[in-house]
Amino acid sequence: MMNWRALSQTKQDRIWSEVNKIIKWKPGSRCHHIIPPDPYRVFDISSAMSSKAGHNDVSGVLSDLETSILKAFQLGTGKNDVMYALDWQHDGYTFSPHQAMPKDEFGEWPVPVFPNGDYYFFFHQDFSWGLLGDPWKCAITVFGEELLEAIDNDPPILFRNK
């Protein structure tokens, strides 16, 4: 997956250290609250966990989420900018949202937007904004004015008020 470049362990450790400072997250502690910098908004994504919660086409909702978030990432980055995609306790990557976004055999990015069992975090290269997926709280937190504005302009179905 050419656009997705695995981070070296040294680089990944450095990035996680920065992330833990920025979002005041202490993984492994009893209270693993994610506290991002202002401005931020927390979106409840529990409705995508079950078709009983109001979305009959869960795969369509998740596809819409990925498409909308990719557009927002593109609006918030320059053509030469990169982003970090982090999967808690797994490989992290850099990628450009302006290049092709190949998927794996399950039809997902190497680090999916929807937190389907692990913490998935996305950050602009300068950490000025990001998207934080928390599977245990069934939430996606978006921080940074630029990313929030981009998402507000074309929100995914999952983020719209019901």
UniProtKB/Swiss-Prot annotation:
Q: What is this protein called?
A: Uncharacterized protein YxiI
What Pfam families does this protein map onto?
A: DUF2716
Q: Its gene?
A: yxiI
What the entry lists under InterPro entries is as follows: DUF2716
Native source species: Bacillus subtilis (strain 168)
